UniProtKB/Swiss-Prot annotation:
Designated name of the protein: Serine/threonine-protein kinase pim-1
Biological-process GO terms, alphabetical: apoptotic process; cellular detoxification; cellular response to type II interferon; negative regulation of apoptotic process; negative regulation of innate immune response; positive regulation of brown fat cell differentiation; positive regulation of cardiac muscle cell proliferation; positive regulation of cardioblast proliferation
GO MF annotation list: ATP binding; manganese ion binding; protein serine kinase activity; protein serine/threonine kinase activity; ribosomal small subunit binding
Gene of this entry: Pim1
Record's comment on post-translational modification: Autophosphorylated on both serine/threonine and tyrosine residues. Phosphorylated. Interaction with PPP2CA promotes dephosphorylation. Ubiquitinated, leading to proteasomal degradation.
Subunit structure, interactors included: Interacts with RP9. Interacts with HSP90AA1, this interaction stabilizes PIM1 protein levels. Interacts (ubiquitinated form) with HSP70 and promotes its proteasomal degradation.
Phylogenetic placement of the source organism: Eukaryota, Metazoa, Chordata, Craniata, Vertebrata
Length: 313
């Protein structure tokens, strides 16, 4: 039963971060060719980031995602400890990849003359949160709480590793339907976490905070909390609260569904117009709504019956 599995994950905490010096991947030219190690399957998706294909690791039949990123589309570069110049996305993924299950793991990477290829874990069966909500509508609060807790822990893990995701949204959250676990994906808009102000943003505008819309400036932690507020609203109402810049700047939240007063309070707190008024991660974790119980298994089984074949057994 998926919901009971989600409940069992509530104890999870951010894991130690990966030490870049401890696991150095050799430059692509020193490896066996990608084609000899991975079998490339159908296209999963494409966009400004490049293209992602399903795949299988030949050695053990492990399902993987194979992401191709063209070099001329890469605007932010980083450097590994061995001096290799790579997309910042590779640097960030290597920093957050660990035994912590809430963030997608980078398994390998390859450099080609005109592109980079990233090999990422691919859980099965899986569905992103956008499609999950689109198919089912607004989520019951117990289910939303289970997902939101895991997203919060994933974002905390990233920050503990010195990584700012900068594109927290439903499309970047995968739900492993067999385990009830979420995974935060797509670090292509991310950056190294810093205490000073950011003046660039490449994430999704309707999840961006009002200070970015008005002043093109924001601090990483408070902007992440704003995005979490948008995400929680999306879960319990079935859609995002703001579509246009003027709505983001006003920050007036209207609830389209029946939502408990405690959940409303948490959402509005995260969506405070002044960044300094927003809660910290610890305050979110300790909020009364986050301490609520999940539905009994019988009720949740009805709610989640259509998740996937056998997932509610």
């Amino acid at each position: 039963m998926l919901l009971s599995k989600i409940n069992s994950l509530a104890h999870l905490r951010a894991a130690p971060c990966n030490d870049l010096h401890a696991t150095k991947l050799a430059p692509g030219k020193e490896k066996e060719p990608l084609e000899s190690q991975y079998q490339v399957g159908p296209l999963l998706g494409s966009g400004g980031f490049g293209s992602v294909y399903s795949g299988i690791r030949v050695a053990d039949n492990l399902p993987v995602a194979i992401k191709h990123v063209e070099k001329d589309r890469i605007s932010d570069w980083g450097e590994l400890p061995n001096g290799t110049r790579v997309p910042m996305e590779v640097v960030l993924l290597k920093k957050v990849s660990s035994d912590f299950s809430g963030v997608i793991r980078l398994l390998d990477w390859f450099e080609r003359p005109d592109s980079f290829v990233l090999i990422l874990e691919r859980p099965e069966p899986v569905q992103d949160l956008f499609d999950f909500i689109t198919e089912r509508g607004a989520l019951q609060e117990d289910l939303a709480r289970g997902f939101f807790w895991q997203v919060l822990e994933a974002v905390r893990h990233c920050h503990n590793c010195g990584v700012l995701h900068r594109d927290i949204k439903d499309e970047n959250i995968l739900i492993d339907l067999s385990r009830g676990e979420i995974k935060l994906i797509d670090f292509g808009s991310g950056a190294l976490l810093k205490d000073t102000v950011y003046t660039d943003f490449d994430g999704t505008r309707v999840y961006s905070p009002p200070e970015w819309i008005r002043y093109h400036r924001y601090h990483g932690r408070s902007a992440a909390v704003w995005s979490l507020g948008i995400l929680l609203y999306d879960m319990v109402c079935g859609d995002i609260p703001f579509e246009h810049d003027e709505e983001i700047i006003k920050g007036q939240v209207f609830f389209r569904q029946t939502v408990s007063s405690e959940c409303q309070h948490l959402i509005k707190w995260c969506l405070s117009l002044r960044p300094s008024d927003r809660p910290s991660f610890e305050e979110i974790r300790n909020h009364p709504w986050m301490q609520g119980d999940l539905l009994p298994q019988a009720a949740s089984e009805i709610h989640l019956h259509s998740l996937s074949p056998g997932s509610s057994k």
